[in-house]
Regions:
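A short, Trp-centered hydrophobic/proline-enriched beta-strand micro-motif
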Residues: 40-46
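Broad, structure-driven detector of short, well-ordered beta-strand segments within folded domains
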Residues: 51-61, 77
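Acidic, proline/glycine-rich low-complexity IDRs
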Residues: 1-35, 63-143
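Glycine-centered tight beta-turn/hairpin loop motif at sheet-sheet or coil-to-beta transitions
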Residues: 49-51, 72
Length: 143
């Protein structure tokens, strides 16, 4: 198995009292993902090392976001290109954020992405992945 650890957040007030499980089984990983509720349990991270991991966040109303990095610099977001250009609000990592509706996938899709990454460390090729764009904006005064 490619994944070496599982981090599952569990927010109690403003404190994360989640778990870190070394050498998790697929059953432990699947259970942690299924427990995401968008309230107290908002993020699961599957790590191979400090720079390579897959994160699944959200869970409320059956909406999840999934992203992967292999170098902690470039990130791939799982997307559903059939969805409209709209914004959904999700709690991820204990905070509410605005996410493109295209980034919000269902549980089965999130589990498929996690299962492939867990087993092989690769992106599931039957799904759509999009490289995250840099969020840095330069002022014309600084150029």
């Amino acid at each position: 198995m490619f994944v070496l650890n599982l981090s599952a957040e569990n927010w109690v007030g403003n404190q994360d009292e989640g778990d870190l499980i070394e050498s998790p089984t697929w059953n432990q990983i699947e259970q942690a993902i299924r427990e995401l509720d968008g309230k107290s349990k908002t993020l699961v991270t599957l790590g191979a090392d400090d720079e390579c991991y897959l994160s699944i966040g959200g869970g409320e109303s059956g909406k999840y976001i999934v992203n992967v990095t292999f170098d902690n610099v470039r990130f791939q977001n799982l997307v559903d290109p059939s969805k409209p250009d709209a914004i959904d609000k999700l709690f991820v990592g204990g905070q509410e954020g605005n996410y493109s509706a295209k980034m919000c996938v269902n549980l089965e899709t999130a589990l498929l992405a996690a299962k492939t990454f867990t087993a092989s460390g690769k992106l599931e090729t039957s799904l759509f992945w999009e490289e995250e764009k840099a969020l840095v904006m330069l002022s014309s005064n600084n150029i």
